[in-house]
Amino acid sequence: MGFVDANTISKMSRLRCGVPDHFSLNKSHELHLHIPTFSSHYTFYPGHPKWPRTKRRLTYSFQPGTRTDVINPILHATQMWASVSHFTFTQARSHNRANIKISFQFGDHGDGFPFDGPGGTLAHAFPPSDGRLHFDGDETWVDGVLPGAIDMQTVGLHELGHILGLGHSPDYNSIMSPFFGSGQRKFLGQDDIDGIRALYQS
């Protein structure tokens, strides 16, 4: 029989990504799980979906009417992923033709993963090559660190990892950890870099 300890309750009450945590472990993780110092924690979606070799130049777009102050944080997030991979990201003029479609949604918005209002689930994204990235429009989004608010760049960086094919990492220092704190900014960690390079063998 399982039990809920203080640590579990703390995690359950944290802000988090809405993507489920059931991912397949990478081979390196399976081989080195017994050696924590050298283990990797990155995971992939079942079947390891990824963008085809012909799609290394990805376009992204915001749903028309999206507030302009979220554009730069997402730009910076794409630049971070580009700096450690073979991907490039360009903002598209047409939302419908973009590889990555970014939007703010509220409550039940028709994709099977309803948002829950302020707190709780912050955002979710779909694996390659779906390209949908949804932020919960009920959250307080900012560019930077502000108590009680959510950093758009941090969550965008995480969700773009899902868009590229990475799952959640149990390493809280990884950008792919499913948990976030308000008033917090995170960056790519070595585990994230190792994961994207392993998935695309670069």
Range-by-range predicted roles:
Residues M1-S202:
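Zinc-dependent metalloendopeptidases
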